Regions:
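Internal, well-folded beta-alpha domain core
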Residues: 110-128
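A contiguous strand-loop segment
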Residues: 1-86, 122-123
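Alpha/propeptide regions of enzymes that mature by internal proteolysis
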Residues: 70-72, 76, 84-116
Length: 128
């Protein structure tokens, strides 16, 4: 399967390629938008390096070594704000969780179903 996407955001952004090898999890690769971290600074600057360190927690998409992929896209609807007394997770951490821990699509669904989702930045999102 091939997956493609664009970054046609309102504001200019720098896409950072993120390779992650979590201890006890699956290796993955994906992109983070540095403007979501408050900077588009060059990586040779202090601000750029600080943003790059946060890249694994600001990914917009990725695929892990098992072939599980996840992409987040924005919606024009009321932001998700579940409250069913489950542990809370936000959009970025949901992506990290799936990439690090899911070996199949069903595992990804099961992992995410264990949390109350809270959308970030006042927007609503969906995953594919």
């Amino acid at each position: 399967m091939r997956t493609g996407r664009n970054y046609d955001f309102k504001d200019d952004t720098s896409a950072l390629l993120v390779r992650n090898h979590p201890r006890g999890g699956y290796a993955s690769i994906g992109f983070a938008a540095l403007n979501n971290l408050g900077t588009n600074a060059p990586l040779d600057s202090v601000a750029g390096r600080a943003a790059a360190l946060m890249g694994p927690f600001a990914q917009l998409d990725g695929v892990n070594e098992c072939g599980v992929s996840i992409v987040v896209l924005t919606l024009d609807s009321k932001p998700c704000d579940q409250d069913t007394q489950r542990p809370v997770i936000n959009t970025s951490l949901a992506i990290r969780l799936v990439l690090d821990r899911a070996a199949t699509t069903q595992e990804a669904v099961d992992l995410l179903s264990a949390y109350d989702m809270h959308a970030m930045a006042g927007r609503d999102y969906h995953f594919f």
